[in-house]
A protein has these predicted regions:
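C-terminal motif of bacterial Sec signal peptides marking the signal peptidase cleavage site
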Residues: 16-20
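Bacterial signal peptide processing site
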Residues: 22-25
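Short acidic, flexible loop segments centered on an aromatic residue
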Residues: 73-94
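Intrinsically disordered, low-complexity Pro/Gly/Ser/Thr-rich segments with frequent PxxP/GP/PP motifs
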Residues: 92, 98-125
Length: 179
């Protein structure tokens, strides 16, 4: 009679332990999963109003910021990761890396909710060896790499880092706005 409660308690403990280890996900592809039972789908640019504001760098060596504000006009959606930003010049396209040490936090946007991210750059000289003559920037949202938005770049050339190839620019993670 005593062994039944001990056996039952052990079985119950094992079941609870195994259940606690399962997150209900499917593994590495969880961030791409758009199954409604696993939460909102990835946000798409086609459902966003896009506004751009800049604190342009006035002279070579100065730091400037370009803030992109997104307002969700569609159904609730989620941003998991960083925006992918490219700087476009006549002869090349350069990827902008996330800020050093930055960690992306998942952000869920309801209809009408707003978020923003910032491209920070160092204005370069009018010298192709030291700067990239950017004419546009393009960005996509995580989970929607084919849905790009391009904006005109009127903030001058972007400095190259000392390695001569990498641009001196970074992109922030998504910041929540409003309530």
């Amino acid at each position: 009679m005593r062994t039944l409660p001990v056996t039952l308690a052990a079985a119950l403990s094992a079941t609870l332990l195994l259940t606690a280890c399962d997150d209900g996900g499917t593994g590495a592809d969880d961030t791409k999963n758009t199954d409604p039972s696993n939460g909102p789908a990835a946000c798409a640019l086609r459902d966003m109003d896009v506004e751009v504001g800049a604190g342009a760098a006035p002279a070579a060596g100065d730091t400037g910021n370009v803030t992109v504000t997104l307002t969700n006009q569609g159904a609730q959606c989620t941003l998991k990761g960083f925006p992918a930003v490219d700087l476009l010049a006549d002869s090349s396209t350069t990827n902008v890396l996330p800020e050093e040490g930055a960690q992306a936090q998942p952000l869920t946007l309801g209809k009408g909710a707003t978020t923003s991210f910032t491209i920070t750059y160092v204005r370069g000289e009018d010298d192709p060896a030291k700067s990239l003559a950017v004419h546009a920037a393009s960005f996509t949202l995580p989970g929607a790499p084919r849905d790009a938005h391009e904006l005109k770049w009127s903030y001058g050339p972007v400095a190259r880092q000392e390695d001569g190839g990498t641009v001196d620019a970074t992109v922030s993670g998504f910041e929540s706005s409003g309530d």
